[in-house]
């Protein structure tokens, strides 16, 4: 059986999801096709085309729309109000959030005590859940949204200067905002989840955003191939295969 897969979002031309997931599926002996599809409105697109695909990876601006369109959602979707994966089972759609897994797995080999999150969107909510044990602080340009997250997740709203001094600084900021806001030396580790842009120097260490892309994709492949969040064989080797595919796609 050849599965038909796609990644949806806008803009989508830069997405490396097809390359990394097809490389992993080939390594696992699975057959699939994987498309990039420009979609701005999931509610409009899904009824017309959704039944043609076995699973759909979702990026911005669709993650917040998916929860309301699925027949069932996992606990992480409920906690984050964000879904980045839709799995079709018979005539129903199941929504999942694998961003939480992608975030935590990317940072797993690092040591840190304090965590700060920059941003207030869907990815920031996933980071809140992924690092909830560390009671993360938050900074956002939109103070109203930042205060809403503070109330929803019990985090602490802080000034930018304080956030940048954390052991682990997770940036979910769009565009060049992070470059515009930084420019000094910082004591911690920067985890910039956006992989398609240059990240600022000045931090003591760096977690590339491509690592999150790969680990959240491994989370999606777990669901695609097992129906649940069950680990796949030798995921460390699978990560290396996917990282190589991402580098070749540059």
What are these regions (language model features)?
Residues 44-45, 153-166, 182:
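Short acidic low-complexity segments
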Residues 4, 55, 114-116, 168-170, ...:
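Structural motif
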Residues 105-106, 205-245:
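Active-site capping/gating segments
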Residues 15, 65-66, 143-149, 176-181, ...:
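Short, charged/polar "capping" segments at the starts of alpha-helices
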Residues 53, 83, 112, 133-135, ...:
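Short, well-ordered alpha-helix to beta-strand connector turns
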Residues 9, 97-100, 107-133, 139-143:
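Glycine-rich adenosine-cofactor-binding loop
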Residues 79-85, 171-175, 182-213:
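ADP-ribose/adenylate-binding Rossmann-like module
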Residues 2-110, 197, 202:
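Phosphate/diphosphate ligand-binding glycine-rich loop within oxidoreductases
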């Amino acid at each position: 059986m050849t599965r038909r897969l796609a990644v949806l979002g806008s803009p989508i031309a830069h997405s490396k999801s097809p390359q990394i997931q097809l490389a992993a599926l080939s390594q696992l002996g699975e057959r699939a096709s994987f498309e990039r599809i420009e979609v701005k409105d999931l509610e409009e697109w899904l009824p017309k085309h959704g039944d043609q695909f076995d699973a759909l990876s979702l990026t911005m601006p669709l993650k917040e729309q998916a929860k309301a369109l699925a027949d069932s959602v996992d606990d992480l979707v409920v906690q984050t109000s964000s879904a980045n994966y839709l799995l079709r089972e018979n005539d129903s759609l199941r929504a999942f959030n694998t961003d939480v897994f992608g975030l935590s797995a990317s940072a797993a080999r690092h040591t840190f005590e304090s965590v700060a999150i920059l941003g207030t969107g869907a990815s920031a909510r996933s980071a809140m859940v992924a690092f909830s044990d560390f009671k993360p602080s938050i900074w956002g340009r939109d103070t109203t949204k930042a205060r809403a997250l503070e109330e929803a997740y019990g985090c602490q709203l802080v000034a930018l200067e304080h956030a940048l001094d954390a052991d682990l600084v997770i940036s979910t900021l769009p565009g060049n905002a992070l470059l515009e806001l930084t420019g000094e030396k910082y004591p911690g580790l920067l985890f910039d989840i956006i992989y398609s842009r240059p990240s600022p120097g000045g931090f003591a260490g760096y977690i590339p955003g491509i690592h999150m892309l790969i680990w959240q994709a491994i989370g999606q492949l777990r669901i695609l191939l097992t129906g649940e969040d069950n680990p796949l064989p030798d995921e460390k080797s699978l990560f290396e295969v996917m990282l190589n595919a991402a580098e070749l796609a540059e």
